[in-house]
């Protein structure tokens, strides 16, 4: 069932939860659009405000007009010393996606004048201990074949004068015309002096790489920065790109499983393990390969220590004949090919590689912020963008509540189920609680439902700014038969009361949560 068609937006909604309506004095308090509730207070917008918002939320759900900002960066950064500048590798990059970026506002003079190109410009830098952004680099966004806008900060670095062990990247987006869209922060990045040369152990897992984590691979011929190429995917094929990198999920593979099947295997990846790389965007995979440690341009065949950040490694295709050097993943200009290694004449447990077969591995992080400005009538920035991480259902019967765990929550947010606003309580920047609307708000014939109803969940700011989420809520019905159906006896006079009790019991025990992918 389409939640967008649940009710007429011109009619103020009836109470949608099992809680009673507030009295008139409470409603007057909450009719203030800019009201900031105290933690622990249940709030709901006024009926007039809800009616206005409801039509806009419905349009956002139907037209899919969200805008997404995705920041992709490495987990660690190597510190620069003296006058040197060790630019972050791979360089932090930003993707702007979603149809909302292509909506042309009527008030936008630039669009009216017929100008083309990105509607925003970006500036990226490091946060500082004082909380303000340091020197920034301007991002030049380019449109990709998949319609995403891509920008890259190639000259960011952290000097030895900065004594922090961790920092964040700060992205500032400004709309054409000068209005600030918002300031977005990356995940924490760990600062290291140089790649660890010691034998790794699981006693200190800070820099180890676990199965299922995201990594990037890059190659530098003769250790020259200008020759850096990144493993990436373009047009459905693996390539070695000089300008754009991709994140891959590193799975511990099972040699006895079907290709593409990754049974859950916890733990840290060790050299000598069979692994598989899966592109996080396209899902395209490389064949299972054995990851080898590299030292002095040789693959070490007898090393089984844990892999560490910024280590040099090689990927050997299994099935090499005994006594041979093995076949390895290699780049040739922009192509990804196979390289036939030679056995080391002096040491049997080594294979001789070329420069193009030696890769540097590093863990990556990404963070996404989604919003839609088409509903809001505000000049305020869209940030901080709330992020939902988990949901926790409690109660049932007359009242079922749902707690949202995440970050960047504030008292001006309301939880929406489809186009229905839920009574919301702000607890902390990491917790919101809402009352689950009755299923009758989405289907008048809920007593006769035979299929689950899945409702998308979102957050809406007091000024109408819409924040979609990846979460949905599913009402799962009991099997019921509509009265009057051929061959079915008429229900008893107390059938409605019985059905209501069944509904309440079902409400208590049979809610299910799903994450949309």
Swiss-Prot record:
It is found in: Nucleus. The lineage of its organism: Eukaryota, Metazoa, Chordata, Craniata, Vertebrata. CDD domains: IPT_RBP-Jkappa. Interacts weakly with EBNA2. Does not interact with any Notch proteins. This is Recombining binding protein suppressor of hairless-like protein. Keywords: DNA-binding, Nucleus, Transcription, Transcription regulation. GO terms for cellular component: chromatin; nucleus; transcription regulator complex. Residues 26-37 have a biased composition (Basic and acidic residues). The keyword Nucleus applies. InterPro entries: Beta-trefoil_DNA-bd_dom, BTD_sf, CLS_fam, Ig-like_fold, Ig_E-set, p53-like_TF_DNA-bd_sf, RBP-J/Cbf11/Cbf12_DNA-bd, RBP-J/Cbf11_DNA-bd_sf.
């Amino acid at each position: 069932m389409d939640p967008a068609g649940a009710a007429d937006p011109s009619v103020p909604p009836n109470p949608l939860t099992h809680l009673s309506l507030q009295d008139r004095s409470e409603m007057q308090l909450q009719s203030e659009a800019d009201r900031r509730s105290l933690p622990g207070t249940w709030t709901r917008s006024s009926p007039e405000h809800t009616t206005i918002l409801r039509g806009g939320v419905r349009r956002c759900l139907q037209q899919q007009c969200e805008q997404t900002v995705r920041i992709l960066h490495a987990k660690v950064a190597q510190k620069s010393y003296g006058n040197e500048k060790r630019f972050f590798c791979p360089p932090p990059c930003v993707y702007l996606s979603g149809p909302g970026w292509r909506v042309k506002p009527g008030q936008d003079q630039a669009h009216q004048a017929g100008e083309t190109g990105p509607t925003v410009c970006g500036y990226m830098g490091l946060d500082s201990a004082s909380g303000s952004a340091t020197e920034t680099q301007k991002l030049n966004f380019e449109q990709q074949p998949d319609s995403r806008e891509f920008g890259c900060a190639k000259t960011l670095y952290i000097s030895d004068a900065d004594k922090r062990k961790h920092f964040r990247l700060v992205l500032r987006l400004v709309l054409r015309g000068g209005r600030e869209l918002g300031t977005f922060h990356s995940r924490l990045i760990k600062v290291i002096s140089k790649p660890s040369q010691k034998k790794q152990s699981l006693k200190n897992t800070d820099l180890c790489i676990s199965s299922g984590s995201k990594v990037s691979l890059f190659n530098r011929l003769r250790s020259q920065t200008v020759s850096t190429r990144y493993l990436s995917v373009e047009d459905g094929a693996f390539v070695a790109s000089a300008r754009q990198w991709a994140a891959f999920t590193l799975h511990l593979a099972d040699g006895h499983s079907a290709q593409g099947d990754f049974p859950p295997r916890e733990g840290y990846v060790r050299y000598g393990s069979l692994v598989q790389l899966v592109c996080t965007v396209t899902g395209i995979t490389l064949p299972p390969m054995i990851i080898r440690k590299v030292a002095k341009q040789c693959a070490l065949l007898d090393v089984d220590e844990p892999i560490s950040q910024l280590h040099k490694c090689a990927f050997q295709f299994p099935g090499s004949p005994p006594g041979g050097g093995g076949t390895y993943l290699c780049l040739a200009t922009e192509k990804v090919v196979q390289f036939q290694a030679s056995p080391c004449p002096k040491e049997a447990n080594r294979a001789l590689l070329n420069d193009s077969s030696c890769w540097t591995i590093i863990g990556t992080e990404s963070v996404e912020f989604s919003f839609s400005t088409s509903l809001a009538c505000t000049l305020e920035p869209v940030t901080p963008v709330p992020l939902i991480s988990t949901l926790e259902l409690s109660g049932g019967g007359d009242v079922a509540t749902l707690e949202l765990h995440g970050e960047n929550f504030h008292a001006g947010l309301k939880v929406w189920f489809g186009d229905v606003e839920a009574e919301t309580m702000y607890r902390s920047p990491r917790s919101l609680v809402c009352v689950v609307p009755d299923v009758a708000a989405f289907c008048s014939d809920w007593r006769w439902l035979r299929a689950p109803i899945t409702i998308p969940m979102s957050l809406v700011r007091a000024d109408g700014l819409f924040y979609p989420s990846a979460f949905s809520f599913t009402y799962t019905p009991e099997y019921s038969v509509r009265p009057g159906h051929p061959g079915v006896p008429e229900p008893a006079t107390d059938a409605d009361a019985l059905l209501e009790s069944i509904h309440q019991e079902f409400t208590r025990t049979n809610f299910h949560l799903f994450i949309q992918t």
